[in-house]
């Protein structure tokens, strides 16, 4: 084997020596608490400065039926002075003051109904947050149109005027026509074929079959509604109505409600029929649909309120179900009295917690594969708010611009992705979903890097994205008239980029050019192994010229499949450290963080700390790790040095 001689200049040598000896360097972030599955302390932390885009007040929930809270916000703790804000009988643990707050110190307290007030907590405001504050939900509700359709489109004539040669239009009609020929699905499952399986196998197959019930019903309705809006052909109306009325007969406590995704899709499918064909349905048909939709919508509200807002992560809720609930309640508004309360909750929780698996820096802690399941939620909800109120969350929240860099560094055009979290090892290139996402974000943010990325993706993967349903109707009906950014972009990508809020970073010799790029992807997540986040803190993957050369192994078939729980979920499947054969804990508490980033034109250095990833009070495990710090050094064009302490 030929050995490469390393010729490093004197000053580079001093830098490297200083880095590894721990000389004082710029430090990233601040100390962080260990996250549990549920919020245990108030937010903002008592006595702290507001660090979010606008003040968001939360407190630990009290479990039980009919729990509610009173909350009071003041400038002092005196009993005889009027409150700035007082809310009573809140059924959940979120308060966003949708009012301008001057710089200074604020005091607040809460009480559970029937109990005493908490002590006062305080937080300080040192910046002007007024421009960031979303509109009050009451203002948003007041702007919801009275008529129908509201959801897929609000101007039928506009949809009929779309060019017949438009590829999205052609794809939708073609897919709808194929479904016209299929028999209607039902909500039963033949369990006799499970006779020779064990209980785990039966449960897995039964859930997969139950998911298909809602999926098939929704898929038909969704495409039939779209095809009708595009063509005006009543054959799509009759089929959509037939499917929607059939779903009203399905028992929510049966197979159609066994899996939350299926349950939510049944709910939204019926709502789409009600909304799209409102003027064509009889009063009896409308009532039948409304009654069935309410059963499922009420169930979800009771399930999530006073729970999911203080939970570190509820994956299905944030991936699709919040979006489905938001859409359904937009349709039901002014038809069902409770939707005012329900929609206010979903509005509040979106603006209090989103993006739930990231932050201002961008990135996504559940990785590349599962980010695709959040794309439509992250785009469609703020788009509706902007359309109704003018409030532009895409411009307010830095996440939306910073995700462009995350795409370049972690889902690189023409190359393999970073490989972290469930199913990301399957991603050998960005594919149609990421192309579609970049195009929409380019239009909505007018940030040129998104256009650059989309163009690069098409250069390496000239796909017909019309065949991918993700964001297709959004693109066709809501942003078709929006221009792409026109500003010229001078590309000067740094050697390293960290997305601390999203749990990943990357060092690359030639980012954006896969044919000559050496990339090392770094993992340091603020949430430990939970959901689709794996026990891979302080691990790394390496690619060269867009191909994997040193990567973790494994795959996921199901959350509980033996290969995942015995291999791919665990540290031993990644380029990490085992302690006497033990990897990192499977717990939200097994966190890691980036501590330093130093870079120039000839080197890049990153330090990350996973000292807390090997113990958890939740799992009652402690593998005795006092310190696990990993140092990464990239010396272009093709030298990587990794040093552990």
Q: Each PLM stretch: what is its role?
A:
Residues 150, 172-173, 206-413:
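Aromatic-lined, polymer-binding surfaces characteristic
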Residues 365, 370-645:
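Extended polysaccharide-engagement surfaces of secreted carbohydrate-active enzymes
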Residues 32-62:
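Pro/Thr/Ser/Gly-rich low-complexity, intrinsically disordered linker/stalk tracts
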Residues 115-120:
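Short Trp-Ser/Thr-centered turn/loop motifs at beta-strand boundaries
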Residues 33-41, 124-153:
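Low-complexity, Pro/Ser/Thr- and charge-rich linker/hinge segments at domain boundaries
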Residues 1-32:
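Bacterial Sec-dependent N-terminal signal peptides
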Residues 70-103:
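Recognizes extended acidic, P/S/T-rich segments that occur
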